Amino acid sequence: MTDFHDKPNIQIMFDSLAPTYDKINGILSLGLHIAWNNALVSLLGETNHLLDLCAGTGRVALSYVQNYPRASATLVDFSTKMLENVQKRHPSAPFSYITSDVTHLPLPDNTFRLASMAYGLRNLSYPLEALREVYRVLQPGGHLGILELTRPATYNPVYLLHKLYLNLVVPSVGRFYSGNSYAYSYLKESIRDLPRDAALEAIFHAAHLRPIRKRKLLFGTATIWILEK
């Protein structure tokens, strides 16, 4: 399988979540998303200019320039409100901004040595098309780091706890803090419906991106892949 199921109009949904997105995700992950973002940044290593895809409110890009103070970043997201949130909160950050879908990047071929995509893969209706576009803008030998919320293996002792967490805690907390229970029901479903590792890695290979590192976080509730062009 190279495409995920049809997505609702998540651009409008993420626009509506922009004001509370960081706070809610911090609560839902018990603050672990900060450590996970830092792990992604560490595995990617240093470059002068990072391409941050599905950038959201810019947490990965901010972590990147804090860890590598000489770096700058281009943030790409299809949610105007998310990018406006970054600009408003961090006006002096060394960032440029592009409002665009990952499947149609207005960027030249072979431009970036490093790119990141955190919590965005499962929101793509056409991941193969998007990853081929990332391949196009990466330099030969360049790396894409993907951080995604995933499901523990069924034999994992935390599998049932994680399932209960997704079904009960995520929608309830999202509804309480954002007033948008649908959005966090979608989050639950997007994690549940994300293909398992073997299927995802087949998509990576189909896009000519070779997995060179993989790290499971918190019993497999999140996963980092480093892919090479």
From Swiss-Prot:
It is an enzyme of class 2 (transferase). It catalyses: a 2-demethylmenaquinol + S-adenosyl-L-methionine = a menaquinol + S-adenosyl-L-homocysteine + H(+). One of its GO terms (molecular function) is demethylmenaquinone methyltransferase activity. Keywords: Menaquinone biosynthesis, Methyltransferase, S-adenosyl-L-methionine, Transferase. The keyword RNA-binding does not apply. Pathway: Quinol/quinone metabolism; menaquinone biosynthesis; menaquinol from 1,4-dihydroxy-2-naphthoate: step 2/2. It comes from the Bacteria. InterPro entries: SAM-dependent_MTases_sf, UbiE/COQ5_MeTrFase, UbiE/COQ5_MeTrFase_CS. S-adenosyl-L-methionine binds at residues 57, 77, 101-102. GO terms for biological process: menaquinone biosynthetic process; methylation. The keyword Transmembrane helix does not apply. Its EC number is 2.1.1.163. Methyltransferase required for the conversion of demethylmenaquinol (DMKH2) to menaquinol (MKH2). Belongs to the class I-like SAM-binding methyltransferase superfamily. MenG/UbiE family. HAMAP family: MenG_UbiE_methyltr. This is Demethylmenaquinone methyltransferase. The gene is menG.
